[in-house]
Amino acid sequence: MASISETSDDGSNGGVPNQKPEEPHKNPQEEKENQNENPNEADEEDDHQDEEVENVPPIPRKIPPVLIENTIAPLRRCHYPKLSLLSNAFRQVISSEDLFQVRSLIGSTEPVLYTLITFKYPTFEEGRWFILQRRNNTSLKLNCVTSLPPMFLGCTAVTIGHKIYVVGGYNFRYNKTISTVLEIDCRFNTCRHLRNMKRDRCSAVAGVIDGRIYVVAGRQRRFDDWVEVFDVETERWELVPGPFSSFASSSGKFIVHVVLDNKIYIMDGDYCFAYDPRRRRWETWGPESAQRSYWHLSSCVVDDLLYAIVPREIFGASIVVYDPRGIAWRPVMGLEFWPNLVYFESKMANFGGKLVILGCYRSSFDYYRKDVWCVEVALEKHEDGQIWGKVESLSLVNAFPMSPFFELSRTVTI
């Protein structure tokens, strides 16, 4: 084993690094006699040191596949940054596509939440993607993904596997709605431009059905171009002709939407719609319908059930759940101790089967410093069909000097 000794610069050697301290003066005759007595001592010591160095195993230039599969791939991604510091070989493995293919094959993938945040007060800033990262087994942090460019206001996004597809928006520089499409590879946080949509769209609806991306509205309602579909394999767009609901907003801008039961559910003021791309059919429900009654902005789908945050005094619960087969809302039980966040400005997402809510204790219109909190809720379905929830964690994940607006929250699998 090779050892490294440290030398101190304490003035005994004149302040010159790595220079040995000056030894006491010796008689030249004594030095000569000492050298004659042990002529091979120095050579033996050098040979011994060389032998120790030779016994040190070399740093591998390539990590064996069996080591990748058994030790690196099963690790949580939060450990990869430290692992990459060990050697260039580890850095190459962690930045390779092969590692993520192995993670998928052995079932070690994990959900990763991306949130698009804009800042509108006191000054406007374009949206940036933030990633919710787990620093250890319990601690969470919301960090900006600086390698990704700012997003256009009014864009929408869907996820397929480890990719986020961002479509449309409004370009303030040129004062126009756009048809831009970006593909974000969340394994490496890189993006590329795809073929533009056939129409410019802002504040559109988007959903993935049968592996294809459907984009609805985002422009004036017209029969022939209100819907278009993107094939991710051929990277081609096609317009989908009507019909559409006559109750839908003519401006084509909607409040919130989700994919549920292979349909795209859309909330528009007093009305609720469902678009079935397979049959090209629309369903419409009025303000008194069960579908519209408790659906609010902060909502998401888990296991084909729609969850939404509501004022507690309405239903006696903080979160309600909608089953499209039973066409009924029910309270999520077990959430008596619930953080008092500003939920009409929060954003809920499906995080690997759990509910994750990002929000603040103060309104975004309050110009003071904003602390962003994350609530993790585990879900459990009992034998009687009742859904129970448990707050697993409440974490302060970031603080901003300006008011954050949570535009989108999307979960990918990496």
From Swiss-Prot:
One Pfam family per UniProt: Kelch_FKB95
Kelch repeats: 163-211, 212-258, 263-302, 305-349
InterPro entries, alphabetized: F-box/kelch-repeat_ARATH, Kelch-typ_b-propeller, Kelch_1
Region called Disordered, residue ranges: 1-61
Keywords: Kelch repeat, Repeat
Biased composition (Basic and acidic residues): 20-35
Domain (F-box) ranges: 58-105
Acidic residues compositional bias, start-end: 40-54
Disulphide bonds in the chain: none
PANTHER family in the record: F-BOX DOMAIN-CONTAINING PROTEIN, F-BOX/KELCH-REPEAT PROTEIN SKIP4
Name recorded for this polypeptide: Putative F-box/kelch-repeat protein At2g29800
Source organism phylogeny: Eukaryota, Viridiplantae, Streptophyta, Embryophyta, Tracheophyta
